[in-house]
Structures are given as C-alpha cells and as structure tokens.
C-alpha cells in the first residue's frame, strides 16, 4: 500500500486503460488449493469469466489491482477466490477485509465467500451497521479470517481495536465509485491509515470518476489495471415462440412430439430444478430419446465430460438448470426450449440471449401453462419483445 500525495497521474476520467492482458482460462491452471477448487466447482462455476481469467492471478501473486467491471461479470467471485487462496485458515485473525457500499451487498458477498470456502474451515463475518454492536465485537474477537463490511461499522471496529489489522494481507474495495459517492470517503481514508503499510489493495469499480482515481493514486503501488467490458446479451435475431400447454403434465407429450424437430440441430432444454432435470431425463430416456443432463449436484468431472460431448456434437440434446445458463457457452445452439419459464425474468436472457457480436440466429420455444401467462407477459415487457404462438412450420426456421 502506497501512501504518498504525489500529483495525480493523468488518467482520463471514465475509463481506465488496461496494462495487463495475461489470461488464465481454467480454474485448474490457477494453482489453487484443492479444497478451494472443490468449493468453486461445487458452487456451480465451470470456467472463469473474463474478469476472473484476468484478475485472479495478479491478485494471488500479490499485485495491487484496479479492475473496472460492471456487476454481472463475476467480480464478487474474482476477489472471493483470490482472498480465499491467500489466507491461512489455521490463523485465527482477519487476513482479508472487503468493503462494500451497502449492507445488502456486504451480506451477499459474505454468502459467496462462505459458499466457495465451504471446504476450507474458515470464518467470514459480515460487519455492518444496523446490527448489534456487542454481537459484532464478540464475533470479531474470535478472529474470522475474512471480514466483509460497510465503511462506517468497519472503521468503528478497527478504532475500538476489536477488528485487529496486524495480520491483514488484503484490502478489497468493491463498488468503490458507489462508496465514495455515498459519502464514505473520510471513513475509507481513515481505514487506509489504520492498515499495515504492506497490505495489498484491490479496487473494483464500474466507473472511474476523479475521487476513485485519487484513492488509487494515494494508496496503491504500481497497480495492475484491468478493464473488462460487459458483453451485452441480446435477443435480436432470436425468434421467440410459446406453446400453450394446458397442464404441467402435458408438457412431456408436447416435448416428445417436438423431438424430431428438436434433433435437426442441437438443443438445450431448461428446467427450474435439479429434480426436474433428472425426472425429465429419465422420462425421455424411457421413451428411447437420447438426451444428456447437467446440473449443480453433479461432480465437476462428470459435468466436464457431458459438456465436452455436447460441444463436440456427439450429444444433441442437453437438459439443464439455470445455474448453468450463464456457464454454457452455447453459441452453436440454435434451439432453446424453456420446459419451465425461468423463475426470474433476468434469467430469460441468459438462457436464450446471444452475445451481440456473434449475431447468431436462434429459436426459443417456451412451454406456457395457464399459470405462466403472467410471467410471460412480464418477460415481454421487461425485454420489450414479442413472444408469438409457435407456427406449424417451426422446423423451417431452425
């Protein structure tokens, strides 16, 4: 951590320039602790996102890092994985401190750290305003290895000497632009002054206004700068249809009738639960249809094999849960069937959207029961799109 007041380097506001472009494109090649790797795969990650491919390694190696990335790019897991790799679970003391602008975000980050660190026997405490100070103090005295919190409460706990900083290796500021614009500048500067000089600093921000750049110049040493543009998903070029299915029980027959059409090309069929994925796979297999299935309960090695077969084209139909919608690189898939409409509308675009640059054409077919009509209308409104009744000649469109 640098602490100098030299003149601000001339960095244009708004966007940083990357000075680092090394990419590590699989978690296996990051040389992570086996129990951390296990946690990453159990959490449902398959391969690192763009920011994870670029930022995890420099953080692990000890560089100060500035990453400019929007939410939805996988940044929480980026710094969670890095922090978990760097801490010593046997040392009962705070070794990584993560600051977030809101209590909700802090709690969300805590959940991710706990989930990914599931096999590591460590503690992660959320140190946030609005909770009982005494309980907070007690939890911090137990020496959780990772503390995530909001600036006000964290500063208070460090000043009371309850949150000890002598073993602190890593200080992470998430959504730095938000924190500074919410008036936490003074608290953040105070926290910096209270940390050991040797603390490594990682700063994440969607935008780079002047006040964020000032923090980077004052408190960071030769930072690695990484800019990750969010790839916009689009529904353009995708023909979206629905089939009215009166009852849930009729979906299976509807899908069987469609099977010939489906296998002209490769298709992904989405269900809302792992249980449903298994059930549907069993039912279709019993009817002599060839399908493969994938969800988060499976061992990573098993999922890799299934994905490989699907990518190579040797399996044609893949049944999956939402967990994998974000992880499946299905650019080659031209047909997606929502056996169940997604439980939340944001997932709709992850299931059927395409990276705009590829401009892939595709067809999406939604099975809609009477109970689903409202959700379908919501999806149409949310994306300003039209989902029309499926025509008879759908095979010609795929």
Swiss-Prot record:
Subcellular location: Cytoplasm
Catalytic activity field: ATP + H2O = ADP + phosphate + H(+)
Binding-site positions, ATP: 69-76
InterPro entries (UniProt xref): DEAD/DEAH_box_helicase_dom (IPR011545), EIF4A_DEADc (IPR044728), Helicase_ATP-bd (IPR014001), Helicase_C-like (IPR001650), P-loop_NTPase (IPR027417), RNA-helicase_DEAD-box_CS (IPR000629), RNA_helicase_DEAD_Q_motif (IPR014014)
Record has Glycoprotein as a keyword: no
Record carries keyword Endoplasmic reticulum: no
Gene3D superfamilies xrefs: P-loop containing nucleotide triphosphate hydrolases
EC number: 3.6.4.13
Primary localization: cytoplasm
Domain Helicase ATP-binding: 56-226
Motif (DEAD box): 174-177
Domain Helicase C-terminal: 237-398
PROSITE patterns the record matches: DEAD_ATP_HELICASE (PS00039), HELICASE_ATP_BIND_1 (PS51192), HELICASE_CTER (PS51194), Q_MOTIF (PS51195)
Motif (Q motif): 25-53
The entry's keywords: ATP-binding, Cytoplasm, Helicase, Hydrolase, Initiation factor, Nucleotide-binding, Protein biosynthesis, RNA-binding
GO molecular function, one term: ATP hydrolysis activity
Summary of the function given for this chain in its UniProt record: ATP-dependent RNA helicase which is a subunit of the eIF4F complex involved in cap recognition and is required for mRNA binding to ribosome. In the current model of translation initiation, eIF4A unwinds RNA secondary structures in the 5'-UTR of mRNAs which is necessary to allow efficient binding of the small ribosomal subunit, and subsequent scanning for the initiator codon.
Description of its domains: The Q motif is unique to and characteristic of the DEAD box family of RNA helicases and controls ATP binding and hydrolysis.
Family, similarity comment: Belongs to the DEAD box helicase family. eIF4A subfamily.
Subunit structure of this chain's protein: Component of the eIF4F complex, which composition varies with external and internal environmental conditions. It is composed of at least eIF4A, eIF4E and eIF4G.
Name the record gives this protein: ATP-dependent RNA helicase eIF4A
Native source organism of the sequence: Aspergillus clavatus (strain ATCC 1007 / CBS 513.65 / DSM 816 / NCTC 3887 / NRRL 1 / QM 1276 / 107)
């Amino acid at each position: 951590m640098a602490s100098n007041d030299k003149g601000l380097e001339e960095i244009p506001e708004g966007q940083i320039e990357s000075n680092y472009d090394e990419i590590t494109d699989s978690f296996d090649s990051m040389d992570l602790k086996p129990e951390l790797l296990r946690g990453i795969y159990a959490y449902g990650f398959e391969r690192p996102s763009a920011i994870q491919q670029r930022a995890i390694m420099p953080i692990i190696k000890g560089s100060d890092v500035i990453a400019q990335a929007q939410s939805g790019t996988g940044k929480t897991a980026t710094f969670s994985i890095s922090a978990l790799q760097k801490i010593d679970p046997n040392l009962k003391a705070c070794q990584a401190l993560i600051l977030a602008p809101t209590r909700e975000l802090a709690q969300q980050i805590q959940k991710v750290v706990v989930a990914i660190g599931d096999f590591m026997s460590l503690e992660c405490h959320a140190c946030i305003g609005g909770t009982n100070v005494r309980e907070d103090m007690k939890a911090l005295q137990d020496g959780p290895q990772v503390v995530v919190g909001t600036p006000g409460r964290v500063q208070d706990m460090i000043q009371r000497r309850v949150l000890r900083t002598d073993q602190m290796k890593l200080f992470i500021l998430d959504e730095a632009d938000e924190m500074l614009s919410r008036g936490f500048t003074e608290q953040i500067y105070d926290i910096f002054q209270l940390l050991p000089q040797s603390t490594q600093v990682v700063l994440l921000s969607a935008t780079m206004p002047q006040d964020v750049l000032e923090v980077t110049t004052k408190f960071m040493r030769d930072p690695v700068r990484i800019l990750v543009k969010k790839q916009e998903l689009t529904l353009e070029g995708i023909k979206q249809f629905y089939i009215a299915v009166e009852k849930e029980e009729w979906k299976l027959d509807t899908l069987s009738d469609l099977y010939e059409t489906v296998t002209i090309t490769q298709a992904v069929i989405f269900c809302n639960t792992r249980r449903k994925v298994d059930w549907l796979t069993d039912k279709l297999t019993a009817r002599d249809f060839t399908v493969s299935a994938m969800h988060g309960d499976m061992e990573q090695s098993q999922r890799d094999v299934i994905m490989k077969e699907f990518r190579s084209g040797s399996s044609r139909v893949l049944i999956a849960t939402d967990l994998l919608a974000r992880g499946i690189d299905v650019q080659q898939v031209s047909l997606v069937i929502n056996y169940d409409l997604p439980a939340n509308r944001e997932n709709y675009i992850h299931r059927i959207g395409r990276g705009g640059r590829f401009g892939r054409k595709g067809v999406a077919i939604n099975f809609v029961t009477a109970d689903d009509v409202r959700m379908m209308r919501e999806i149409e409104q949310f994306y300003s799109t039209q989902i029309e009744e499926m025509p008879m000649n759908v095979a010609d469109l795929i």
